[in-house]
């Protein structure tokens, strides 16, 4: 496998997060297999990648806080809570379906 290889994954945003991503709820992405330091791609790298390459809204603080998904955002990896998968240390796999759901709603 070459260093420029990618992993096909599906990303979804819900609960209002799609507003930060050009009002698009679903993305089919080709994520690089390695992060900036040459390590296998993890959810932490995916979050950075989304902020740097996909998010057009300048309000990144509504999605991330201290380099991780901010509290109040549920992350599902293949329909399972990311806490069961190792949270942001989970290594992204081919055809993963990763969903970010805001559980915070205005009144």
Swiss-Prot record:
| CDD domains in alphabetical order | Ubl_Urm1 (cd01764)
Alphabetical keyword list: Cytoplasm, Isopeptide bond, tRNA processing, Ubl conjugation pathway
| GO biological process entries | protein urmylation; tRNA thio-modification; tRNA wobble uridine modification
Entry-annotated residues carrying 1-thioglycine: 107
Question: At which residues is the cross-link Glycyl lysine isopeptide (Gly-Lys) (interchain with K-? in acceptor proteins) found?
Answer: 107
Major localization class: cytoplasm
Q: What pathway annotation does it carry?
A: tRNA modification; 5-methoxycarbonylmethyl-2-thiouridine-tRNA biosynthesis
Location relative to the cell:
Cytoplasm
Question: Sorted alphabetically, which InterPro entries does this protein's record hold?
Answer: Beta-grasp_dom_sf, Mopterin_synth/thiamin_S_b, Urm1
For this record, the Gene Ontology CC terms, alphabetical, are: cytosol
Instruction: State whether keyword Ubl conjugation applies.
Output: no
Q: How is it modified after translation?
A: C-terminal thiocarboxylation occurs in 2 steps, it is first acyl-adenylated (-COAMP) via the hesA/moeB/thiF part of UBA4, then thiocarboxylated (-COSH) via the rhodanese domain of UBA4.
Pfam families, alphabetized: Urm1
Q: Which family does it belong to?
A: Belongs to the URM1 family.
Report the HAMAP family cross-referenced here: Urm1
Q: What does this protein do?
A: Acts as a sulfur carrier required for 2-thiolation of mcm(5)S(2)U at tRNA wobble positions of cytosolic tRNA(Lys), tRNA(Glu) and tRNA(Gln). Serves as sulfur donor in tRNA 2-thiolation reaction by being thiocarboxylated (-COSH) at its C-terminus by the MOCS3 homolog UBA4. The sulfur is then transferred to tRNA to form 2-thiolation of mcm(5)S(2)U. Prior mcm(5) tRNA modification by the elongator complex is required for 2-thiolation. Also acts as a ubiquitin-like protein (UBL) that is covalently conjugated via an isopeptide bond to lysine residues of target proteins such as AHP1.
Question: What protein am I looking at?
Answer: Ubiquitin-related modifier 1
Query: From which organism does this entry originate?
Result: Pyrenophora tritici-repentis (strain Pt-1C-BFP)
């Amino acid at each position: 496998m070459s260093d420029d290889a990618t992993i096909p994954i599906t990303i979804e945003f819900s609960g209002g997060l799609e507003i930060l991503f050009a009002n698009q709820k679903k993305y089919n992405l080709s994520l690089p297999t390695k992060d900036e330091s040459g390590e296998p791609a993890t959810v932490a790298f995916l979050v950075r990648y989304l902020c740097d390459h996909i998010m057009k809204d300048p309000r990144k603080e509504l999605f991330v806080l201290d380099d991780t998904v901010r509290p109040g955002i549920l992350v599902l990896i293949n329909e399972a809570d990311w806490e069961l998968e190792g949270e942001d240390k989970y290594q992204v796999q081919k055809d993963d379906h990763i969903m970010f759901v805001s559980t915070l709603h205005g009144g």
